[in-house]
């Protein structure tokens, strides 16, 4: 944990695993990888890669028999743990960094909120939406996946980066639609609760394009998140082109209901 890298991470965490804008901050995946598959998993990916694979295609081949659904299951597990830094190596330090994830959504009517362009999960990236659960014992989130290329919410400025870093001076692009992708869209989503004693509680994961999921909120929940992973039906290789508008996005909208 360092202040500089972490602040950048919280601003850019929704991006694809190999996105150029998080090339120095996207290290939490490797904590999840080595914790689940052993310390040598990291070195095996580099030593046993085969052209034209990227690192995650090599991971799928070595550990998941090239099963894309298993890959997304592994990525959702990683994302849901990353939201509270639930990794053994991070345990001594993670308490000070709780409650920092955020995502922007815009109202689109009838209680629905649409994910902002600037928070939309890219292919194999995730969004962590904090939920204000005070006084409630059950939450239901209705989910609707949107087609890539769909219109942004009316209030969404639709600004994007053009340049080699995600810095304010490079926030010069403008769009009124989400980025398109040459693949059918897909998602994984569910809940994560962080309790006051540091315990984490995870819901089951859902993969429906449209549906409603509920979660009984544990007592002593301090932070509650709805986590959405971008999981298109075919693997998307991420190209370093310094143009955010070319990055595959998996947009969605949600409606949140509480029971007290």
Name each model-derived stretch:
Residues 51-260:
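Beta/coil-rich, acidic/histidine-enriched accessory regions frequently appended to metallopeptidases
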Residues 1-36, 40, 46-83:
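Acidic/His/Gly-enriched intrinsically disordered linker/tail segments
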């Amino acid at each position: 944990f360092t202040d500089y890298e972490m602040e950048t991470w919280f601003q850019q965490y929704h991006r694809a695993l190999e996105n150029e804008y998080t090339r120095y901050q996207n290290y939490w995946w490797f904590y999840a990888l080595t914790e689940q598959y052993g310390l040598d998993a990291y070195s095996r990916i580099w030593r046993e890669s085969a052209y034209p694979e990227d690192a995650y295609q090599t991971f799928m081949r070595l550990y998941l028999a090239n099963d894309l659904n298993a890959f997304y299951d592994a990525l959702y597990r990683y994302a849901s743990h990353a939201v509270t830094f639930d990794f053994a190596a991070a345990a001594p330090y993670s308490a000070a960094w709780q409650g920092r994830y955020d995502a922007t959504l815009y109202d689109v009517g009838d209680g629905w909120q649409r994910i902002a362009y600037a928070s939309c999960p890219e292919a194999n990236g995730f969004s962590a939406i904090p939920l204000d659960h005070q006084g409630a014992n059950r939450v239901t989130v209705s989910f609707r996946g949107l087609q890539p290329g769909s219109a942004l919410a009316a209030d969404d400025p639709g600004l994007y980066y053009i340049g080699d870093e995600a810095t304010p001076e490079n926030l010069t692009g403008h769009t009124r639609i989400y980025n398109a992708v040459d693949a059918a869209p897909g998602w994984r989503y569910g809940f994560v609760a962080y309790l006051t004693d540091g315990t984490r509680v995870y819901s089951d994961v859902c993969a429906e394009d449209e549906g409603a999921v509920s979660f009984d909120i544990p007592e002593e929940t301090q932070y509650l998140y709805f986590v959405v992973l971008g999981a298109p039906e075919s693997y998307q290789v991420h190209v370093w082109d310094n143009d955010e508008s070319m990055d595959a996005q998996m947009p969605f909208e949600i409606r949140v209901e509480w029971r007290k």
